[in-house]
Amino acid sequence: MAAAHTIDLTLAHGGTLRGTLDRDRQIAVFRNVPFATVPKRWRAAVKKAPWTGILDATKQGPIIPQDPSIMPVWKLAPEKGSDFDELNALNLNVFVPISALKNETKADPIPVMTWVHGGAFTWGSNADPLYDAVNFVQHSIQLHLPVIVVTINYRVNVFGFLASKELQEELEESPEHSSLSLYDRSIGNWGLMDQKLAFEWVRENIASFGGNARNVTAFGESAGSASLHYHMVLPSHHGLFDHAIMQSGTIYALPPERVHKEGQAHFDTLLEHLNIPLSLTSREKMRRLRSVDQLELLNATRSLFNVRHPCLDNGKVFPALAADGSRPYTIQVAARDIIAYDPILKSVLLGSTKDEGTAFSRFFGDCNLQAWPSLLRQLVPFAELDAEAERVYGVPKTDADVERIFSKLIGDAGFSYSTHVIGDTLLRLQSARGADQFKLLRYNMDVGMNKLDEMQLGLGATHGVELPFIFGAPKLRALFTEKELRLSKEMQRLWISFAYQEYYEAMASSDGIRVPQVENGEAFVMTNTHEIKIGRSNRLTEAQRAFWNRLAQMQLATADILV
């Protein structure tokens, strides 16, 4: 018989789990729940087979080998102590109200929120203290809007995103090739494919926890948000969730690469770093690369790649041709085509932070007047646009000006502009389907966190700053000021009520807040007075939008487009 502080649960498609009871919060937590296994490095994962006996789900499971995050927000409570295991880290954590588990008839299942972490497809896991959802779920109970939160792992860095002709040839020559589906023959997209398996696990098993398998809200930040965008527009990934909250990330921020170009260049660089001769046969290269220990492989990537990308694969995960068959598939074009979006997608809450770029500017080298021309070129590859960029964003006169202007350019290039583009696309989707079939809401995070500015002056509402507010995780809650804690609870209320699709009523309050009219350019705004108000959704001026539109058109017109 289970001890008083644990609880046993039998899944519909799996086995029996033993989780932990938190009676103070009235929740149960099941950690290290396996949803898939990896048969070997650089192969598609397979669903976890049912097991006999009781599986211990009281402790955090292993994670994919990775370095600590280099982003400021994650330094508030860095992940420490988790085991690395590239083959057995596809696990998830489930945070569930005890009341949902006691609902034996499962007659009134509750909404589910599945979290996909960010980290540039290079780091991140469900072990990050930032994503501990115990307080989030407790608050949902207090609001009488109980939800289940699921946090997932997926393969990152070269374990989840690596592509080359050698990987392709080795798979094609392998004994298992003929038994694999066309989809599972994809290379370079294992991280996205892992996510798909996790969402499928939720659909198949969450009813056992008292969750509604037909009311799943996916939410993610940065690469996690970009992942959700991929799932929305890739036909092979449709049907995974019903609603989505996209936080600071779209396909445009992390577009797919090509096997023969960017993928091959990264692969060759990795081999050179590991002293594997490029003159060897594909089979011998792969034999040597597979023999490299997971930590040695991680170390080899440390100075080589800061960001990973999915990879175009000629009709496996990514379509080979556009929907009308007239041209090669280009996801940057598909992302603006409302026909491409998942037909079961019912709503999206879309937003970003005001000062996204302050977290990234230091990664580009010195930000000073001497470096300004080269800094500008990294974001604006066409010299004929330099004058327009300086007219729109300003000409720096001091080193401080360079830091400020460059941070703004980074934020707009990577986040504000793409959020604007996708916001316009989803608004067209709402108009085409009707607001009763699809609804778009917008938010803007315009306030920072006092503790972050103490760590690094000038961060402001930097990339990822909303995460401590949304999760209110135990290791971070003590860092809040009183006003920040109040805002955290209000943001949790908005996120939770979105999962219930009851934001009209849930956001009504004595101060007269109402649901923003997105078609009129409105959004929920988390202000620097630590309140949620209605404000303008678009962060860009008309001149800034025109500048980025022109740059995007020039990129699409070049022969180097990602096809």
What are these regions (language model features)?
Residues 2-189, 213, 481-487, 502-504, ...:
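Non-catalytic accessory segments of hydrolases
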Residues 77-81, 184-189, 252-258, 275, ...:
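Active-site rim elements
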Residues 103-106, 123-129, 160-165, 229-231, ...:
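Short, solvent-exposed loop/turn and secondary-structure capping segments
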Residues 154, 161, 249, 445, ...:
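Active-site loop/turn elements of alpha/beta-hydrolase fold enzymes
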Residues 197, 204, 208, 233, ...:
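Substrate-access "cap/lid" subdomains that shape
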Residues 209-221:
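Alpha/beta-hydrolase fold nucleophile elbow
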Residues 220-230:
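Glycine-rich nucleophile elbow surrounding the catalytic serine of serine-hydrolase chemistry
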Residues 416-420, 424-563:
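Mobile gating loops/cap/lid regions near enzyme active sites that modulate substrate access
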